Amino acid sequence: MSVVPPNRSQTGWPRGVTQFGNKYIQQTKPLTLERTINLYPLTNYTFGTKEPLYEKDSSVAARFQRMREEFDKIGMRRTVEGVLIVHEHRLPHVLLLQLGTTFFKLPGGELNPGEDEVEGLKRLMTEILGRQDGVLQDWVIDDCIGNWWRPNFEPPQYPYIPAHITKPKEHKKLFLVQLQEKALFAVPKNYKLVAAPLFELYDNAPGYGPIISSLPQLLSRFNFIYN
């Protein structure tokens, strides 16, 4: 059973104002109802190769052991990943790095202690996909689209901090990276760069993991323009 506040109008709350007692405070910050992002065809982009880029850790166990050791020294690990989108036949596709036959990841990695998130992601994007001819890549990063936390030194990650966790072991941020109309990417030889359509990712945690399979929902707030 709901109770209607005595000051509430029968036609709904006043729009654009906030009520505190009998006073109204005008909201000055505009609400962004629609964020427009330009997408370009996959065929606009050129993909070359460069020397292999290997993981810091030789196994999952080694990764969590290093995370444990670093946590004791510098605290929670901060990770950033970039979401790059193209389109084919007006269907959005996310660029993923494929290692082997079944492992997919977003480009990104660990931040250095004290490193700015956006500048760190630009550094990592250049290390992973940056071209080799000396031309600097212009990474446009304006939108954080997701936050994930690792509560323990174990694989599970969640888009929230569980109530009983006071010291998460890793915080991962996902950023939308807006691509220029044309670009050249250099892909490490031990990876493939694949374009996965959103309908393939949607609700497909068994194939891509919980983070990548959540991208269709995270990206649904954007209005894509297919150029």
Curated annotation (Swiss-Prot):
Species of provenance: Homo sapiens (Human)
Region of interest called Necessary for interactions with PAPOLA and PABPN1, as start-end residue ranges on this chain: 81-160
Family, as annotated: Belongs to the Nudix hydrolase family. CPSF5 subfamily.
Positions of the Nudix hydrolase domain: 76-201
UniProt-recorded Gene Ontology molecular function terms: chromatin binding; histone deacetylase binding; identical protein binding; mRNA 3'-UTR AU-rich region binding; mRNA binding; protein homodimerization activity; RNA binding
Consequence recorded when altering residue 158 to A: Abolishes interaction with CPSF6
Region forming the signal peptide: none
Protein name in the entry: Cleavage and polyadenylation specificity factor subunit 5
Residue numbers of N6-acetyllysine PTMs: 23, 29, 56
Modified residues (Phosphotyrosine): 40
Function in brief: Component of the cleavage factor Im (CFIm) complex that functions as an activator of the pre-mRNA 3'-end cleavage and polyadenylation processing required for the maturation of pre-mRNA into functional mRNAs. CFIm contributes to the recruitment of multiprotein complexes on specific sequences on the pre-mRNA 3'-end, so called cleavage and polyadenylation signals (pA signals). Most pre-mRNAs contain multiple pA signals, resulting in alternative cleavage and polyadenylation (APA) producing mRNAs with variable 3'-end formation.
Pfam families membership: NUDIX_2 (PF13869)
Domain of life: Eukaryota
Modified-residue entries (N-acetylserine), positions: 2
Tissue specificity: Expressed in the heart, brain, placenta, lung, liver, skeletal muscle, kidney and pancreas.
